[in-house]
Amino acid sequence: MNQQDIEQVVKAVLLKMQSSDTPPAAVHEMGVFASLDDAVAAAKVAQQGLKSVAMRQLAIAAIREAGEKHARDLAELAVSETGMGRVEDKFAKNVAQARGTPGVECLSPQVLTGDNGLTLIENAPWGVVASVTPSTNPAATVINNAISLIAAGNSVIFAPHPAAKKVSQRAITLLNQAIVAAGGPENLLVTVANPDIETAQRLFKFPGIGLLVVTGGEAVVEAARKHTNKRLIAAGAGNPPVVVDETADLARAAQSIVKGASFDNNIICADEKVLIVVDSVADELMRLMEGQHAVKLTAEQAQQLQPVLLKNIDERGKGTVSRDWVGRDAAKIAAAIGLNVPQETRLLFVETTAEHPFAVTELMMPVLPVVRVANVADAIALAVKLEGGCHHTAAMHSRNIENMNQMANAIDTSIFVKNGPCIAGLGLGGEGWTTMTITTPTGEGVTSARTFVRLRRCVLVDALRIV
């Protein structure tokens, strides 16, 4: 994507957000303010109460409990408000963030001693941090960012996507109420009643805010880069490929691919977006996928579906995804072309060429293109091409260590998953902590509290070395 393309996307996103006809939200009891100035001022006061590690631990424990307690309600509200995703999967995301986001335990000071004395390097807070959150993972991102940022000693001003403002505000209020009930300060987490693009743009330049955390697509990340000179931690788009070679456990691969590509109707940037499979095992893999609540489309059906899902396809084959179909259920997408599939269908898949718009474009819906290749070398090369330089996430199913090593090195993504669904890289079924903010564009990768601190050094010369 060149600079002109990015500018056009940014303009389209800003126009969409500005023209939102969502009715004004009521101001909630706690954490939601009528004005941005009042919200930031309240967060500044609250942040002063986070000086002690014990208070951060108390607040985080309250967030974990409230996040898990209200996980289902927030999942239902998110689907109801945005029309995207699956309640059960959003519930799983919310619970995972409440349980698996690291707290203060991942922050350790460094101490250096030598002939010239002692040096202490500590993790200092930024103060009030601005967090821009998406419509795709609204409550989960609020829970995750709240824990990570508070663990680092920060309070947070959230700028939620207008299409998910109700669920985002509800999450912020519930977490604030839990913190206060546990004895913590009010308004550690704040937002405004009617967030819009102007809210985000003001935060990009707001005095006294030194750190911006942006979780969203390419357009919002580019907008942040263009409009701020503050420290920016940004999570952007991805088009994760999954490769299956001839040595793979095909039954396991089929199960993992359908699970990952259909999780929350494919609206997570880390979900599998294109399947590349070696020809000798392609037919068997697709047969096994059909046994996992996935339906294979014919080439004719895919041709009918293409103009429904994609507009403005350019010379590279890349199109603009119709927002009306992002994150919708597979059965509803099939019905758009008069195709009746079982309601429990989780995924539609179709064999395409490598140049097909479905393969080139990040669809963010449960429609998976499948591309055959002659061998694993071709598969890896195509995976690198279709990933598009996002360096976000990729996966491979193989029993060949050398093949996995070659792909891991070639693809150069923040997350690389072997023999499992891509969501395992987010701590959903794999080892490691959870996050909803994978910051590939700015290089921090899978974020935690360690991402959101300032390192400060204190040096004592010629003293306190005891050996």
Residue ranges of model-derived segments:
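Structural signal for hydrophobic packing residues in well-ordered secondary-structure cores
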Residues: L14-D21, V40, K44-K51, I63-A71, ...
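N-terminal Rossmann-like NAD(P)+-binding subdomain of aldehyde/semialdehyde dehydrogenases
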Residues: N2-L120, S148, G291
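Short, surface-exposed amphipathic charged segments that create phosphate/polyanion-binding patches used
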Residues: F204-P207, D249, K311-V321, E362, ...
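Conserved C-terminal structural/oligomerization subdomain of aldehyde/semialdehyde dehydrogenase
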Residues: L339-V467
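Flexible, glycine/charged-enriched surface loops at secondary-structure junctions
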Residues: V53-L58, P185-L189, N265-I268, V295-Q306, ...
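ALDH superfamily catalytic-core signature
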Residues: M30, I143, E222-L347, T353-A354
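Rossmann-like NAD(P) dinucleotide-binding subdomain of oxidoreductase/dehydrogenase enzymes
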Residues: P109-R252
